Amino acid sequence: MKQFKRGIERDGTGFVVLMAEEAEDMWHIYNLIRIGDIIKASTIRKVVSETSTGTTSSQRVHTMLTVSVESIDFDPGAQELHLKGRNIEENDIVKLGAYHTIDLEPNRKFTLQKTEWDSIDLERLNLALDPAQAADVAAVVLHEGLANVCLITPAMTLTRAKIDMTIPRKRKGFTSQHEKGLEKFYEAVSTAFMRHVNLQVVKCVIVASRGFVKDAFMQHLIAHADANGKKFTTEQRAKFMLTHSSSGFKHALKEVLETPQVALRLADTKAQGEVKALNQFLELMSTEPDRAFYGFNHVNRANQELAIETLLVADSLFRAQDIETRRKYVRLVESVREQNGKVHIFSSMHVSGEQLAQLTGCAAILRFPMPDLDDEPMDEN
């Protein structure tokens, strides 16, 4: 996601000027826009004109419109958002108050204005602007002269740097040029890695190559970090996993991720973390039901007693058309975090999110049993 301008006041009102660059960005935008928000974007309007003789002709005209959103339709396959609303600014082509549908797609600039940017909105916005925050896996696939430095988010793989250099061939009696070329290559890859990979965030770093290239690179990376005052801690070194890949091309990463030993190592990453939390909740419902509750009233009551260890929330609840419904879930998330509880926001595009939605979309694992909660109504009705 690209941000051109941000004007959000302390009271939460304000606007941002954005442009989606990746398919995943459209999903973030869908989760940001709500009914009542104001969208300003370039669009196409069919204009019908009539001549003095009574004949009519129509043409499609580009214009800039500002609409107050009344309906939102997202097509995940086409990665398009269709936003229908009334025009709220004077325009030579479209009358004030006339309906129009603005179509948003990747690489189309737009302005989003809200009367309230809450903490979930800002979290989602910052996540979209810096995908590295969501990437808990980094990978370097390489062979001599070619390397791809990638970040893997729950939704996609992002190439952060591609290093392509010509390495002089190794010749008998003339190995120095080859070794200098390799040294220069490893230095370039190390620099790119340190720039794009945040070892405070990622849980695992895969370094993959044929032969011993990965080992030589790893030695150089450690030395590079030491020389630049960023020496790896024991904990950070433990995050690295060296494995085989067929090449340094990006497509080789797919093969690497599918190998059993890598899949096992990645079992505790964010995407897997949500599945793990849901499975733990479902297991507790069978073994310790007084520590596993779902439905807003039960979960909110547990939160009032500072009992929530892990909160599970479906992102669809933050897309509620009723502002007060959204606000109560935002307040719940903020409160649980303030009490040092864990919060997992599940995507409705994933199977685990669909499963949570069947349990009202809101569930909690408690720090201690609360048997009396069963006596209270699950919902407000």
UniProtKB/Swiss-Prot annotation:
Disulphide bonds in the chain: none
InterPro entries: eFR1_2_sf (IPR042226), eRF1_1_Pelota (IPR005140), eRF1_2 (IPR005141), eRF1_3 (IPR005142), Pelota/DOM34_N (IPR038069), Ribosomal_eL30-like_sf (IPR029064), Transl-rel_pelota (IPR004405)
CC terms in the record's Gene Ontology section: cytoplasm; nucleus
One example GO MF annotation: metal ion binding
Subcellular location per the Swiss-Prot or TrEMBL entry: Cytoplasm; Nucleus
GO biological process: cell division; meiotic cell cycle; nonfunctional rRNA decay; nuclear-transcribed mRNA catabolic process, no-go decay; nuclear-transcribed mRNA catabolic process, non-stop decay; ribosome disassembly; RNA surveillance
Superkingdom assignment: Eukaryota
Keyword Metal-binding belongs to the record: yes
Cofactor needs: a divalent metal cation
Keywords, comma-separated and alphabetical: Cell cycle, Cell division, Cytoplasm, Meiosis, Metal-binding, Mitosis, Nucleus
Keyword Metal-binding listed: yes
Subunit structure: Component of the Pelota-HBS1L complex, also named Dom34-Hbs1 complex, composed of pelo-1 and hbs-1.
Family: Belongs to the eukaryotic release factor 1 family. Pelota subfamily.
Function: Component of the Pelota-HBS1L complex, a complex that recognizes stalled ribosomes and triggers the No-Go Decay (NGD) pathway. In the Pelota-HBS1L complex, pelo-1 recognizes ribosomes stalled at the 3' end of an mRNA and engages stalled ribosomes by destabilizing mRNA in the mRNA channel. Following ribosome-binding, the Pelota-HBS1L complex promotes the disassembly of stalled ribosomes, followed by degradation of damaged mRNAs as part of the NGD pathway.
Name the UniProt record assigns to this protein: Protein pelota homolog
Protein species of origin: Caenorhabditis elegans
Lineage: Eukaryota, Metazoa, Ecdysozoa, Nematoda, Chromadorea
